[in-house]
Amino acid sequence: MKNKVVVGVTQRVDKIDIYGEWRDALDQRLVDWVVEAGFIMVPIPNVLVDVSLSNDSQPNLDIWLNTINIDALLLSGGNDIGSVPQRDVTERYLLRWAAKNSK
């Protein structure tokens, strides 16, 4: 049996005022689309990055990436660039990581 491709998917960040929480989120239709295409979908948490670090050094995200071992990367829609710095750092870092680690 052939192994399925594991796709890491970035998430938007939603502020839930009623609970005083910030949450990573994905549209369920995107999840359905990835799964229907035959892939294993793994959401990538934005909380793994430290916005005070450079875009070249994100040790927590590196540990996560090395543990999960994704085969492909999908940047989801969501927040405007600049509105959620944590997401911006996550996606910039992931793009650099993907360029260095393309299979």
Task: Give the positions of each predicted feature.
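N-terminal beta1-alpha1 cap of cysteine-dependent amidohydrolase-like domains
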Residues: M1-K103
